[in-house]
UniProtKB/Swiss-Prot annotation:
The keyword Protein biosynthesis does not apply. Promotes RNA polymerase assembly. Latches the N- and C-terminal regions of the beta' subunit thereby facilitating its interaction with the beta and alpha subunits. NCBIfam families: rpoZ (TIGR00690). The lineage of its organism: Bacteria, Pseudomonadati, Pseudomonadota, Betaproteobacteria, Burkholderiales. One of its GO terms (biological process) is DNA-templated transcription. Signal peptide: none annotated. The gene is rpoZ. Belongs to the RNA polymerase subunit omega family. This is DNA-directed RNA polymerase subunit omega.
Amino acid sequence: MARITVEDCLKQIPNRFELALAATYRARQLAQGHTPKIESRDKPTVVALREIAAGQVGVEMLKKVPV
């Protein structure tokens, strides 16, 4: 099993706080049934981090959050 680390994700989103918000929002989307952008059997939080590390998802997720 490949491990995902925060350092891998920080290469894509340098701000830890934005990273946490983007990962949280994406994980919630995945938990609600949205289609993952990568192939994985992991839990939504891990899939969200893997998507961020792969560059499939970024800070644009924060622009979709309703205020």
